[in-house]
């Protein structure tokens, strides 16, 4: 006799008995206690929730560094882009004071701006 499993599948009695035996084998063994199983489940959950985001962040960070290095080496964007020149405000203010002081007379403090 056959039993209908799905829309297109049918399983004979022998195959269904084999499935039942396999299900019994996959159930809890007498050697493992529920505490051990719950501990293993908890560790697996923690590894997914804590380890994978860390690895994702590492890949994103190294990808950003790699992309920046490629852009710099192949000059895909102009090196004189002001986005590459990041200086502290104190250095900018000191450069502006140096330009406006009367002792400079034509000296340019462009390396700070």
Swiss-Prot record:
GO CC annotation, single: MIM complex
A Gene Ontology biological process term: protein insertion into mitochondrial outer membrane
Disruption phenotype: Leads to reduced levels of TOM complex but retains the respiratory chain.
A family per Pfam: TOM13
Transmembrane segments: 39-62
Broad class of where this protein is predominantly found: mitochondrion
Subcellular localization, as worded in the UniProt entry: Mitochondrion outer membrane
Alphabetized UniProt keyword annotations: Membrane, Mitochondrion, Mitochondrion outer membrane, Protein transport, Transmembrane, Transmembrane helix, Transport
Subunit structure: Component of the MIM complex containing at least MIM1 and MIM2. Interacts with MIM2; interaction is direct. Interacts with TOM70.
Task of the protein: Component of the MIM complex required for mitochondrial outer membrane protein import. The MIM complex cooperates with the receptor TOM70 in binding of precursor proteins and promotes their insertion and assembly into the outer membrane. Involved in import of the subset of proteins with multiple alpha-helical transmembrane segments, including UGO1. Required for the assembly of the TOM (translocase of outer membrane) receptor complex, which is responsible for the recognition and translocation of cytosolically synthesized mitochondrial preproteins.
PANTHER family listed in its UniProt record: MITOCHONDRIAL IMPORT PROTEIN 1
Protein family membership: Belongs to the MIM1 family.
Identification of the protein by name: Mitochondrial import protein 1
Native organism taxonomy: Eukaryota, Fungi, Dikarya, Ascomycota, Saccharomycotina
